[in-house]
Amino acid sequence: DLYNEPGGSGGYRYGERSLPLLQNIFTWGRTVNPSQPLSAGVWDMSLTNLNKFQLENSDVITYHTYEGLDSHQRLIDTLKQYGRPMICTEYMARTQNSTFQDIMPMLKKENIGAINWGLVAGKTNTIFAWDTPLPDVTEPSLWFHDIFRSDGTPYSTEEVECIRSLTK
């Protein structure tokens, strides 16, 4: 992606005011005659103008969602109309009912690439959900993200087996 989460996220949102920057980024990207596809991932369906530009100008459709199976499938069905390859650049949030066992089989069936950004529990603290107060740093019973503990053992052997079976 040339631009992650156009419109902003977290504490401050630029919203549709990010459109001129997004347009410039694609112009700059095209001027170097890239050998790789250009994209900017859709992430907030309320940003209508940004999404329209992203979807019309991306060589491959990238998106992210942390929603569960049904919502994720609806988003895929919407994005299919662009007739381009798709990559889900962020997904899987156990605390939001978005799990490897639910989402990965659907992505495989739909022939959609997937990027999992959390791998090993560590300094990024992605075992904890975003914007969640941490009274202490005790390991939560339900991790938000990540697959392995820092010693290399899996958080869930069932998840690891699911991932292995789907990626062979």
Briefly describe each language-model feature range.
Residues 1-157, 162:
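Extracellular glycoside hydrolase catalytic/binding regions
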